Amino acid sequence: MAEPQRARPKPTPETQHFWDGTQAGELRLQRCDACAHVYFPPRPFCPSCASRKVSIFKASGKGFLYSYVINHRPAAPGFTPPYAIAVVELAEGPRMMSNIIDCPQTPEALELDMKLEVAFEKLDDKITLPVFRPAKG
């Protein structure tokens, strides 16, 4: 029997630039041209000042582990427990939920404030997800 597939995000016109970026191996964020606020998730206006004058830019892909929970139950198709659901604070300021790869999914390995870098997990020809791994060096 085939293993269940992980849920796929559905790009919208407002988020398409983000998904195009992940397919290109880039983590793209938005910056308000009026107040300089950097934000995620993508939206057509600044959540800080409501300006619609926003720019898209390639983020550094660096951040740190802000928070996480380790799921030990097979609650979601496509995941093998245990797996961490993490909140990563990006160097540019926004926080995003993601998964941590390339390290044990244990409290001993997942230290708060540990430095992380983005990696990309290709699900299919249309969707590539940003995931994070411990930073090298």
Predicted feature locations:
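A broadly conserved sequence feature marking short terminus-proximal activation segments
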Residues: 1-27, 135-137
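Residues immediately within or flanking Cys/His clusters that coordinate Zn2+
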Residues: 26-29, 43
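Short, cysteine/histidine-rich loop/knuckle motifs that typically chelate Zn2+
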Residues: 31-34, 45-51
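Short functional micro-motifs and their immediate structural scaffolds
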Residues: 40, 53-55
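Conserved hydrophobic positions within beta-strands
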Residues: 63-65, 100
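Beta-strand/loop nucleic-acid-binding surfaces
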Residues: 95-106
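Short nucleic-acid-contacting surface segments enriched for D/E, G, S/T with interspersed K/R
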Residues: 104-117
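OB-fold/S1-family single-stranded nucleic acid-binding modules
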Residues: 119-137
